[in-house]
């Protein structure tokens, strides 16, 4: 395979002087700032430009490695003394030829192509999405995948159509928020233009991001793939030991293996918000003996996880005064302070909380929430204090250290501990600390659940991907209960219905699908995963193992292709119709599959 390596190393001042007279006719980024490295000539895109408004004493090194239909851009920055890193941008374009859609890890981002108007349309950081983007056509083929190795610090992306000439413009912006002084920084950008199935390039780019950073995923055990019950949607903060045990008896009979006790166990206040978080002691009126309560649930054959909002210390907690001066900011909507993990005593406090709970109550794991609230709102408070008391200057690094300390301490006590994180803190860095990634909250929204699960499956490797908690009205039809379950079937399903209240016909649907999900778990959750047409909301999703092919259909009038092979084939129908058109080679036929049900074609 043809391979070319171009390496250029010039100081920012030299490069700026050298290119000061260049007008770069036809280049849309000629006036975007000072050019701090020579233009990189790419085989996959047009010229790659690196600019900075104020490079100061920082010197830039840029290199480009081409390997057929993939390229890696490497950028290094060095300063003679420690200084806040210079902001810089990387620009490139390519013709809009066959490009109709766009994908990013942002669950709120559609697949449409935005105009290139200089507005950030995709951001990422350690606990917020991933710097991973793809342009693709209308036939599930990749046109260009872009990935960045910088998964800790914030990266802003401006991606879209430049009106003049109808070109795809891509701009990645680095160091756009407060950053601790440093002497060396580096990043890599992967470009992949292979015309492969769109999700293949996403999956491989995600693996590359982990590999280039040397990340190893948190161990995943079989318990992470078992169906579970969550208290959140039905109870909210109105939880107590007796009610949870009652629900768990029903859940265990249905086949659920784990329960997550969500918010409310630590307070008698029912006003939502987080004013009473921070002390993390069970409310005695609700949970008079937490250890005995957990033991009772264990006796049912279920594991027990407890929710914590990691960074929040409520204004009405005893802990709030203890950590005065050690907050990133105060959240006046949620009535709490957000801890600054750059203080070693803050990290120790949080680690001790979870370690003690694991030991004292014999828990099986945790739902660690709101990691994405570790951020700045305005200026970094450490700057005016000259980082006093902080043993880590960079916030992202501190969050990284905190979560490593938490996960290591818990694994030392219980090697098979379960730790759940919520979308949008996802990706290779977060996979180091947890083994369950849940789709972000979308109560009652089956389509969003399906789409969020699909996105997580592409970027989570072997980590167990969970649905957002399933709920439905007790008057719902059995068919639509089945459709809700099929929309989440390619993730571990979390249920959050009030089990004591649902009618028998809904129980029957749940039991039927739990049996199917258990019997086909390897294929549904661990085998090759192919979600078709993200621009249409994934109307067809396939999972295939060595022995079977499972195809879920979510759209009326869809035609699904079934290859001629000896594998077992199952059709799952969430389309709203009672028939599916199946094509095998040149022949088509209509197969009767009841809405909300499944059928074997063998």
Where are these predicted regions, by residue range?
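Bacterial Sec-dependent N-terminal signal peptides
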Residues: 1-23
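N-terminal accessory beta-strand-rich subdomains and adjacent acidic, glycine-rich linkers
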Residues: 22-209, 215, 562-570, 574
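Active-site-proximal substrate-binding groove within the catalytic cores of carbohydrate-active enzymes
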Residues: 180-184, 402-602
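Glycine-rich, aromatic-flanked loop segments that form ligand/cofactor-binding clefts
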Residues: 198-216, 258-263, 285-334, 416-420, ...
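An acidic-aromatic substrate-binding cleft motif
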Residues: 209-250, 254-258, 266-267
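Active-site-adjacent "subsite" loops/lids of carbohydrate-active enzymes
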Residues: 219, 226, 233-237, 303-360, ...
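Active-site groove signature of glycoside hydrolases
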Residues: 255-265, 350-384
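Aromatic- and acidic-residue-enriched carbohydrate-binding clefts of CAZyme catalytic domains
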Residues: 265-290, 317-344, 373-400
